[in-house]
Amino acid sequence: MRINYAAVGVAGLAYWVLGGIWYSLLFARPFIALMGWTPEQAAAIQQNGEEPSLAVAFVTSLVLAYALALALRFVGAETARAGALVALALFAGFVATSNLETVLFESRPLGLYLINNGYHLVGMLGMGALLAAWKRREARVPAYQT
């Protein structure tokens, strides 16, 4: 199984778009409240331009997609289910555990941890499924018939 760069690009883009939906449409109000921002502070952050942060977030989404594709290749996951299970294991083993330290040692609210890690969990499950199941189309040359 080779790395499918088209799948990595689509998976990274999907993860990035999910982040936009997650933190705007789905969880904007609780996220802002848990961050301790006033509505004015949140508006100021938006007005000051989020483009550099969004660009970096897109690049990190691509890096995550590529790293996940490497892990899937290493374990030989070739179905959506297998890809999602590998992503779940990586999420539980690295993301959820590492981010829990922000609750324990930085006094961040548990709700913020749940919002942030819910995004990573849903995103990684989707990326794992997509990356493992996406099959590269091969050109089919019909057999010569006489």
Q: Which residues does each PLM region occupy?
A:
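Juxtamembrane/disordered regions of integral membrane proteins
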Residues: M1-T146
